[in-house]
Design a protein with these regions (language model features):
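Short acidic (Asp/Glu) patches
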Residues: 38-44, 49-55, 80-93
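Accessory, usually C-terminal, subdomains that scaffold auxiliary metal cofactors
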Residues: 179-232
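Charge-patterned, long linear interaction tracts outside catalytic cores
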Residues: 234-246
Length: 246
């Protein structure tokens, strides 16, 4: 079960925020090739929405290796990323106040770490997630942003995903509503609204393991400021962008 092996950390310190960006760099620039590594010479992928977002990192409990990430963009931003793409239906958020909206993005799960990523103790490096545990880690990330979002009064979040991924989430019992038309953004993707409160109820009713997971709300995440800084050291992640891109 997720909580036995992993934990989600809310990155509320410069150190863990740097790790969040390093995970994004590895997944978006190295693994998937979505972004140009040369644009991020420090090995940290970032954008203008980071200042208005809450970042989360998944790490292994025993080793301390960081293996995944997600962010929740808060409603204080002028425009959510999906709003800049011109793909939303005009009635997508008609009955919601702005402060009840967010956007989920930069969902990252590391699949293929390389030797050049490590320097110093292994517990301080980046790890990877076995294929058979990817869904488990995804659900752990979803729980973290769902619990945090509801605590902040956020009821729905935009997500820009493939229709196949939306169907996968639906099979888990998570509730998504189509919010517009497909758009070409790193491939064809569609905007959806993820209904936080409805998803907790639906997934809990559909799946016993998810019911137990959401019931352990206190374990959804903990703040990095509550963790010994010696176990979260971004300087221990030796990332050579030029080598990674080769």
């Amino acid at each position: 079960m997720f909580d036995d092996i992993y934990e989600v950390v809310l990155a509320d310190s410069p150190a863990t925020q740097a790790i969040h960006r390093k995970i994004r760099y590895h997944v978006y620039c190295v693994e998937r090739g979505y972004e140009d590594p040369a644009a991020y010479p420090n090995g940290e992928e970032g954008d203008l929405w980071d200042d208005d977002a809450v970042q989360f990192v998944v790490r292994e409990r025993v080793s301390g290796r960081c293996v995944g990430a997600i962010r929740l963009i808060l409603p204080r931003t002028v425009d959510f990323p999906v709003e800049t793409l011109g793909c939303l239906s005009p009635v997508a958020s008609l009955n919601l106040r702005r402060r009840q909206l967010g956007e989920l993005s930069r969902v990252c799960i590391i699949r293929t770490p390389q030797a050049w990523m490590y320097q110093g103790p292994l517990r301080s490096g980046l790890g990877s997630v076995p294929k058979e545990r990817e869904l488990e880690v995804l659900v752990g990330l979803v729980r973290a942003v769902t619990v945090y979002g509801l605590q902040r009064g956020i009821e729905r979040c935009y997500v820009l995903i493939t229709d196949a991924f939306a169907r996968l989430l639906g099979r888990l019992g998570l509730v998504l509503e189509r919010a517009g038309e497909p758009v070409d953004h790193r491939g064809l993707r569609s905007p959806y609204l993820y209904l936080l409160r409805d998803s907790v109820a639906s997934a809990s009713a559909k799946n016993e393991e998810l019911r137990e997971l959401f019931a352990r709300e206190a374990m959804a995440y903990r703040r990095s400021s509550e963790i010994d800084e010696d176990t979260i050291d971004p300087d221990s992640l030796l990332i050579e962008p030029a080598v990674a891109a080769a």
